[in-house]
From Swiss-Prot:
Function: Pore-forming subunit of gustatory voltage-gated ion channels required for sensory perception of sweet, bitter and umami tastes. With CALHM3 forms a fast-activating voltage-gated ATP-release channel in type II taste bud cells, ATP acting as a neurotransmitter to activate afferent neural gustatory pathways. Acts both as a voltage-gated and calcium-activated ion channel: mediates neuronal excitability in response to membrane depolarization and low extracellular Ca(2+) concentration.
Cytoplasmic domain ranges by topology: 1-20, 72-98, 206-348
Extracellular membrane side: 37-48, 125-179
Activity regulation summary: Regulated by membrane voltage and extracellular Ca(2+). Inhibited by Gd(3+), ruthenium red, and Zn(2+) and partially inhibited by 2-aminoethoxydiphenyl borate.
Effect of residue 222 to A: Affects basolateral membrane sorting in vitro but not in vivo
Gene: Calhm1
The protein, known as: Calcium homeostasis modulator protein 1
Keywords, in A-Z order: Calcium, Calcium channel, Calcium transport, Cell membrane, Disulfide bond, Endoplasmic reticulum, Glycoprotein, Ion channel, Ion transport, Lipoprotein, Membrane, Palmitate, Sensory transduction, Taste, Transmembrane, Transmembrane helix, Transport
Oligomer status and interactors: Oligomerizes to form hexamers and octamers. Does not form gap junctions. Associates with CALHM3 as a pore-forming subunit in a hetero-hexameric channel complex.
Length: 348
């Protein structure tokens, strides 16, 4: 158990490395899935293209959505995007940075699937077998005498060697080599293009927008850390709240048993009075528990606190916080907007 706890703590403290590892595992899994997939081209005109496009596009979409779902920050992004502005304005640049960071990792597995599919060539062969230039690669003198539907039917069977019967018009091996050559060229071009794009996004872009990049990165990390600390604080409060409630219940039951009362109205009133005294008495709780409760000792107050946190988060201005009024604004009314001027110096 200690080893698992250490691993879990390491993953929590190194979330970025953990997500990179998950993306790498998904990329390897996508390649393994394709190698284990039984590709069966229908070899029918009109159906080949639909089947091939489905194989080429549907699994990458599923892998992309899985990559987003497995990222813990997707809920944080949705919460930050949909929350009311309140006293803290929402920065679109931070939201874009958060989404781009998640999308870059989630796109790794789909890119691997598309690249492996194109390099293998089966999907491309099935989709474009009817577009082979028969006049150039085969017996072009026989093409004018064939109806278009018959020619399409013959070429659609090129991916299926067991039913292909058009060698008198076009050698199947010639068509397969021709289409696979084009597919592999497209595959390597796709790999090169995505590699260059990733290099530009990860390396070159921050050099031209360094200040904006640093600000977006900082506030993105701040939102993540703030949410984690809020969850930890709520968890500590819930544990302390539950502990005090259980202690009050047992103390009230013990008091009733000592007095010999039943669970009637009088016993309920006595238990309530005892519970109130237990909350207000510092001798029944340790100093740590009182600090975790932070003066919130009933359900209604906690619900109002959570509602206020969602609708009106505190401004990012330390040391100038005033108590909240009923409408969510400090001082009873909104403060007028102030123009802030910031100067950034870069030594790069």
């Amino acid at each position: 158990m200690d080893k698992f706890r250490m691993i879990f703590q390491f993953l929590q403290s190194n979330q970025e490395s953990f997500m990179n590892g998950i993306c790498g595992i998904m990329a390897l899994a996508s390649a393994q899935m394709y190698s284990a997939f039984d590709f069966n081209c229908p070899c029918l005109p009109g159906y080949n293209v639909v089947y091939s496009l489905g194989i080429l596009l549907t699994p990458p979409l599923v892998l992309f959505l899985l990559g987003l779902v497995m990222n813990n920050n997707i809920s944080m992004l949705a919460e930050e995007w949909k929350r009311p502005a309140g006293r803290r304005a929402k920065d679109p640049a931070v939201l874009r940075y958060m989404f781009c960071s998640m999308a870059q990792r989630a796109l790794i597995a789909p890119v691997v699937w598309v690249a492996v599919t194109l390099l293998d060539g089966k999907c491309f062969l099935c989709a474009f077998c009817t577009a082979v230039p028969v006049a150039t690669l085969g017996n072009g003198s026989l093409v004018p005498g064939l109806p278009a539907p018959e020619l399409a039917r013959l070429l659609a069977r090129v991916p299926c060697p067991e039913i292909y019967d058009g060698n008198w018009l076009l050698a199947r091996e010639v068509a397969v080599r021709y289409l696979r050559c084009i597919s592999q060229a497209l595959g390597w071009s796709f790999v090169l293009l995505t590699t260059l794009l990733a290099f530009v996004v990860r390396s070159v872009r921050p050099c031209f927008t360094q200040v904006a990049f640093l600000k977006s990165k900082y506030w993105s990390h701040y939102i993540d850390i703030e949410r984690k600390l809020f969850d930890e604080t709520c968890t500590e409060h819930a544990k302390a709240f539950a502990k005090v409630c259980i202690q009050q219940f047992f103390e009230a039951m013990n008091h009733d048993l000592e007095l010999g009362h039943t669970h009637g109205v009088l016993a309920t009133a006595t238990a309530t009075a005892t519970a109130t005294e237990a909350v207000q008495s510092p001798s029944d709780r340790t100093e740590e528990e009182r600090e975790k409760l932070r003066g919130i000792t009933d359900q209604g107050t906690m619900n109002r606190l959570l509602t206020s946190w969602h609708k009106c988060k505190p401004p990012l201005r330390l040391g100038q916080e005033a108590p909240l009024m009923s409408n969510g604004w400090a001082g009873g009314e909104p403060r007028p907007p102030r123009k802030e001027v910031a100067t950034y110096f870069s030594k790069v």
